[in-house]
Amino acid sequence: MPEITLTVNHKAGLHARPAATFVQTCNRYKSNIRVKHGDKDVNAKSILSVLTLGANQGAVITISAEGEDAEQALSDLTKLIDGNFGEGG
């Protein structure tokens, strides 16, 4: 299963609007997508699950995807996170 490790640089971390944007992006794909921070590994397509990660600014997260569009999903999620969720935060 391909995976990527990224640092969340957005000032709000993976919370509120950034989390919603992240989950919306994940839901565009058929692949099973998981996100891990610390000892928590959750369904990346669930806003409540993503919020429970507590991934603040500077958090290192690992995203894995399994399915026919896994590579594209990981590529787009990398762009989203590296681009501060389109908010410039």
Per-segment meaning from a language model:
Residues 7-48, 52-58:
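Compact, glycine-rich, soluble single-domain proteins
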Residues 56-89:
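C-terminal structural segments of small proteins and small subunits
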Residues 2, 43, 72-73:
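Hydrophobic alpha-helical segments and their boundary regions
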Residues 1-5, 60-62:
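Intrinsic-disorder/low-complexity, polar/charged segments enriched in Ser/Thr/Lys/Arg/Asp/Glu/Gln
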